[in-house]
């Protein structure tokens, strides 16, 4: 949520107003500028104006909706909310020959300032590799890496091929503010739905989660995850969340899950959304000219839906409801009509059907093919 900037409560208390009020209380004296009475009161009026300005600052910093980052962090701490720190990206590295042990070796990415250290072995020739720099920059680079001085001379090739757990930057001020106010809406406690949402989000690399209670009988809970970048969670991230929340699955509360709960963690599935439509172009335009912008707009729409995925779990006085995401034909058409050169749209279909596309609660939309 955005920071609220209130109007100053004491903005009218200027030097001139304060001084005039002071002068009005003095009668039958020389009160002209430069006189002793005027000079002595003017100094006090300046200080009083500064006090009023400080009072405005105190009011702004006292409330969660208007506080700046420093004071919002202090306010949120009273609710047990601590800003998420920046984290390290974890990637899959593949090395040849496959029998060489590269555990603990350090590498760098050419033409960047990024360095990496090899950690856990996944299989022969494949390892988890941690970017040594904090923050999201480590999410953006794949490709060949080179050993830093002292590398194993047997290494022939080294390559980062997949982002396993995305890094995140230090939590933004507005994200902290949103979590602060969310803490008043539904209390996270005792393994309720909000509790699972909070405990999953506190694990590095995680994004939205959908919580399905009693999905396989009493005491069972299903957690369906996305990663921090709103993509399906990798098997490594799924395993990490499972290990932290319920490593044994025996209802005994060994992890963070309460006693009596058996938690299963899975990644969301992908549903490719193929769009077919008939476009009419303004003279001087054709499909090749507008295709990049159309693709960008449709990718952005799919991302908006993925970002709203967890919000489809609704807890209301009527109960708990898990609603599907719906890809709207009307949304697609309205966005396409905003592209310069497109003047009409007809016969839009989603995955071959001329209707809105409903996506099951355990899946997320990804843009497939666009055809005209």
Role assignments for model-derived ranges:
Residues 1-201, 258, 286-372:
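N-terminal polar alpha-helical/low-complexity "assembly arms" that mediate subunit docking
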Residues 185-325:
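Carbohydrate-recognition loop of C-type lectin domains
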